[in-house]
């Protein structure tokens, strides 16, 4: 299976950079020259500066309108670089990594996603977006809500990562984001690494594409891992991967249409009874009742790893909270703006023009 990672903006570029570290094809797009220079693993010729004529390489200061315009203006250059990267070999999935709360990512990702769908109709376009932390304030929340709306109309799936679930209580924001970015890559890379790999029951690219072709709805990744010697109940470990503690987004499991589960570990631990017991529970709980599964016994392994992908999700408390907060703020902002404009008009009404005050006076000198 061939996947290309495209990082848009600061957050997306950092995530794509980690994907590049673990040997994925990756490219970074940004309005900030400094952010592109900060990257460590993506080759220089795979770093694209956009919007230079608009912001001069200094970024868009979390303004998605500028991010959108930068992507639109330089879209031919971006697509030319991507086309060169694709070459003559088909791409199964384009993963667009970005931060929902930023400017370049939030504004530019929907523009690029639409262009990719038109240029590569047989490839999936999947957004991987990090939801803003609550500590970041209202502006990132507004950006996230609007971007969710726009992306849902153009991508196949949105894998949303709720940073509030992954952040540890004693971390500051910068520490949290660095660890979260590595966590995102580790989990998704673990899943992709098992596609088209021989196993007792295998997952292939068509399985993954079927699950992710979900009409712009949400998807989430679940994960559970334990030392093989400490696994007393394999079924419980598998169930943990798709329950709230293992998922990256607060979702209603019952609203999911599709599921995909990959299990990797020593053969003596991967007992069929435990596996099917857990998968039967997942099948009963999700609305779509369709589960794709892969079992990968490996005598070299000393741990058991379970990666779960749920898609076709339309109910998520994480998403609902962001959208409701954004709507509330938008109403309050528009009301305050209208009241302010009304007070300004009232205050300034009745003032004369210069011509009224100075009419008839002769100029001196």
Swiss-Prot record:
Location (main, coarse): cytoplasm
GO aspect biological process, one term: cell division
UniProt binding sites for GTP: 10-14, 103-105, 136, 163, 181
PANTHER family reported in the protein's UniProt record: CELL DIVISION PROTEIN FTSZ-RELATED (PTHR30314), TUBULIN-LIKE PROTEIN CETZ (PTHR30314:SF10)
Role description: Involved in cell shape control.
Family note: Belongs to the CetZ family.
Keywords from the UniProt entry: Cell shape, Cytoplasm, GTP-binding, Nucleotide-binding
Domain of life assignment: Archaea
PROSITE patterns recorded: TUBULIN
Statement: the UniProt record of this protein carries the keyword Heme: no
HAMAP family assigned: CetZ
Protein name in UniProt: Tubulin-like protein CetZ
InterPro entries with a match to the protein in the record: CetZ, CetZ_C, FtsZ/CetZ, Tubulin/FtsZ_GTPase_sf, Tubulin_CS, Tubulin_FtsZ_GTPase
Species in which this protein is naturally found: Pyrococcus abyssi (strain GE5 / Orsay)
The UniProt record lists the keyword Iron: no
Cellular compartments per GO CC: cell division site; cytoplasm; microtubule
Lineage: Archaea, Methanobacteriati, Methanobacteriota, Thermococci, Thermococcales
GO molecular function, one term: GTP binding
Subcellular location per the Swiss-Prot or TrEMBL entry: Cytoplasm
């Amino acid at each position: 299976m061939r996947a290309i990672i495209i990082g848009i903006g600061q957050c997306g570029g950092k995530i794509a950079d980690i994907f590049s570290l673990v040997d994925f094809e990756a490219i970074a797009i940004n309005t900030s020259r400094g952010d592109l220079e900060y990257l460590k693993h993506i080759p220089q010729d795979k770093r694209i500066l956009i919007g230079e004529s608009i912001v001069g390489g200094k970024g868009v200061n979390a303004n998605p309108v500028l991010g959108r315009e930068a992507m639109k203006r330089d879209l031919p250059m971006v697509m030319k670089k991507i086309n060169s990267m694709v070459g003559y070999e088909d791409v199964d999935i384009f993963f667009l990594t970005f931060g929902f709360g930023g400017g370049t990512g939030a504004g530019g990702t929907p523009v690029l996603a639409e262009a990719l769908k038109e240029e590569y109709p047989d490839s999936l376009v999947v957004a991987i977006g990090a939801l803003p932390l609550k500590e970041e304030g209202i502006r990132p929340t507004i950006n996230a809500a609007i971007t969710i709306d726009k992306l849902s109309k153009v991508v196949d799936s949105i894998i949303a990562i709720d940073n509030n679930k992954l952040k540890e209580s004693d971390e500051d924001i910068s520490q949290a984001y660095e660890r979260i970015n590595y966590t995102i890559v580790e989990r998704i890379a673990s899943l992709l690494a098992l596609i088209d790999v021989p196993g007792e029951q295998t997952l292939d690219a068509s399985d993954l594409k079927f699950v992710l072709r979900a009409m712009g709805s949400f998807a989430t990744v679940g994960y559970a891992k334990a030392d093989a010697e400490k696994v007393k109940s394999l079924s419980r470990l598998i169930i943990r991967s798709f329950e709230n503690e293992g998922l990256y987004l607060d979702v209603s499991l019952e609203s999911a249409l599709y599921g995909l589960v990959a299990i990797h570990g020593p053969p003596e631990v991967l007992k069929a009874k435990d596996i099917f017991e857990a998968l039967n529970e997942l099948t009963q709980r999700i609305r779509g009742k369709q589960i794709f599964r892969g079992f990968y016994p490996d005598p070299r392994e000393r741990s058991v790893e379970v990666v779960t992908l749920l898609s076709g999700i339309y109910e998520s408390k994480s998403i609902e909270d962001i959208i409701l907060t954004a709507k509330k703020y938008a109403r309050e902002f528009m009301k305050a703006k209208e009241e302010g404009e009304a007070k300004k008009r009232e205050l300034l009404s009745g003032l004369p023009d210069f011509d009224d005050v100075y009419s008839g006076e002769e100029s001196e000198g």
